[in-house]
Amino acid sequence: MKIGVSSYSLSRAINDGELDVFSAIEFIKSIGGEHMEICPGAIGTFESPDDPRIEQIKKAAADAGIDLSSYTIGANFLPAEGEDAVEHKKKEVERLKKQVEIAAAFGVKFMRHDVAWRPIEQTSYDQFEEDLAFVVDACREVADYAAQFGITTSVENHGYHFQGSERVYRLVKLVNRPNFRTTMDVGNFACADEDSVAAVNNNISIASFIHFKDMLIRKNSVCPAGFFPTRSRKKILRGTITGHGDIDLKTCAEIIKASGYDGYISIEFEGPEVCKGAVETSINNVKALFA
């Protein structure tokens, strides 16, 4: 098992010019991280496997002695209103195939992509059932393409619609490919009003990659600045330093250890705290859970 950091966790420092991707790698190494998950949104976008930055980033990671663990990108197989659904899905699948080639150029064996986004009011179970088969076909095609590179693709439990552990489990089982799994974020289940301990227990058997995130969970009916609603809108959430929130991370870690999972674990921090200090505290707290 290797514990490291998603570059997304350092987005604010990167956007403010305090870090770039190369100093982020050095920072992750300096706080005891063993890998960096590549999140292009935080470090720029990549449109070609021949982008010279890829080799530069690979060399920087190798020189620092940390792995590049996963390539994490956005996607949405569902069309916008008025858009042709079949044509949109075809274009999105082809775009993701190009991103698979970029992941392969980075030398990673894991790639997470989103599958579907809808506003909260359109994320009912009936709507999920209506969208499921459409999304399954797209995920299967991307996974089949990734197989030639030895890459496992995955869906993360986020974005409200394909977020609860049952929905994620059904998607993975229906795609029915050995190289399509889930990037399991232990904190994100709260967004779907789900207990993280129960959800981790449900999804650990299909996890190829794990995010450790923590949340403050409140039952307030009013959503103040900095918080966001759960799917039911009955609770509100705010990201925080891993180990400082309300997710039962200790029990989640116990389930993960008992499962025999021996892959990568990424700190994914998205709270208001200063990100560099927050990430350092987070990685120390998660290491203690797995000591």
Which residues does each predicted region cover?
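Boundary/entry segment of secreted carbohydrate-active catalytic domains
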Residues: M1-D20
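Hydrophobic faces of well-ordered beta-strands that scaffold small-molecule active sites
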Residues: I3-S7, M36-I38, L68-I73, M111-H113, ...
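Active-site beta-loop-alpha junctions enriched in small/polar residues
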Residues: Y8-L10, C39-G41, I73-N76, A116-R118, ...
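Short, acidic/polar
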Residues: N15-I28, K90-V100, A192-V200, L249-C252
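Catalytic domains of carbohydrate-active enzymes, especially glycoside hydrolases
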Residues: D20-G41, G107
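Acidic/histidine-rich catalytic cores of soluble enzymes
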Residues: H35-M36, V136-D246
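Glycine-rich, proline-tolerant flexible connector loops at the mouths of alpha/beta enzymes
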Residues: E37-K58, V115-E121
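Active-site acidic/histidine proton-transfer and metal-coordination neighborhood
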Residues: K59-D67, P79-T182
